[in-house]
Amino acid sequence: MKILPAIDLLGGKCVRLYQGDYDQSQVYHEDPVEVARQWQAQGASRLHLVDLDGAKEGQPVNLTAIANIVEALTIPVQVGGGLRDRNRVKQLLDLGVGRVILGTIAVENPDLVGELCAEFPGQIVVGIDARNGKVATRGWLETSTVEAGELAQRMEKLGAAAIIYTDIHRDGTMQGPNLDALRQLASQLTIPVIASGGVSQVEDLLNLLSLESLGVNGVIIGKALYTGDIQLAEAIRAVGNGRWQDVPPLDFPRLG
């Protein structure tokens, strides 16, 4: 299972929100580039960036920080937040971003998502942020009437490379991921699902492994990495490539 450290950008700084509330933000580092370098050095194979200002404004805001992070790293970076038209998507991909994450337009303009999936195959991921099973939009400030599972199935048909599922009520709470919601969502899809929100300890990651056979093949970790409740290297050893579960047994000769 892939471990994706998260960097949330607000005002050019690395922050974390509590349950998506912009009024409950905590600055963890003034320099997001330095944070990104640290996660790469500790073994991350992909980085997850969210432009919180962009999600609120409806267009990317922290472009300088994003460009600097992409330039500083050798691992791929995926970015979401405020991507609601083709030009903004292409702008980020031209910067060297590996994958872009679409959220609001998946609800408001699904045809555009289909066009982007066709133009940029494998590079379009849809982020589904759910509040009580309904999809939230516009930086989590609004809640639609669309069911998360219904939207995910439609996005798969349109060509999305993966679905990132966030349970807003778990995000930043350190209460553990919503396994039931993830199980239900993944069972309806054939494309990969990436879990996000609530992971607070290695045991949460081990619990997610039970969903890997359904297609939950990645997990985004934010606050727990910044508080030190989870060490990235430990998480990778537990559920990433080369985890102890995957090591073949030693073939000792039989005695006698």
Curated annotation (Swiss-Prot):
InterPro entries (UniProt xref): Aldolase_TIM, His_biosynth, HisA_bact_arch, Isoase_HisA-like, Isoase_HisA-like_bact, RibuloseP-bd_barrel
Metabolic or biological pathway: Amino-acid biosynthesis; L-histidine biosynthesis; L-histidine from 5-phospho-alpha-D-ribose 1-diphosphate: step 4/9
Enzyme Commission number(s) of this protein: 5.3.1.16
Enzymatic reactions: 1-(5-phospho-beta-D-ribosyl)-5-[(5-phospho-beta-D-ribosylamino)methylideneamino]imidazole-4-carboxamide = 5-[(5-phospho-1-deoxy-D-ribulos-1-ylimino)methylamino]-1-(5-phospho-beta-D-ribosyl)imidazole-4-carboxamide
Catalytic residues (positions): 8, 129
Disulphide bonds in the chain: none
Pfam families for this protein: His_biosynth
Coiled-coil positions: none
Keywords, alphabetical: Amino-acid biosynthesis, Cytoplasm, Histidine biosynthesis, Isomerase
Main subcellular location: cytoplasm
Enzyme class (EC, first level): isomerase
Listed GO biological process terms: L-histidine biosynthetic process
A GO term for molecular function: 1-(5-phosphoribosyl)-5-[(5-phosphoribosylamino)methylideneamino]imidazole-4-carboxamide isomerase activity
Similarity field: Belongs to the HisA/HisF family.
Xref: PANTHER family: 1-(5-PHOSPHORIBOSYL)-5-[(5-PHOSPHORIBOSYLAMINO)METHYLIDENEAMINO] IMIDAZOLE-4-CARBOXAMIDE ISOMERASE
Protein name: 1-(5-phosphoribosyl)-5-[(5-phosphoribosylamino)methylideneamino] imidazole-4-carboxamide isomerase
Biological source species: Synechocystis sp. (strain ATCC 27184 / PCC 6803 / Kazusa)
Gene behind this protein: hisA
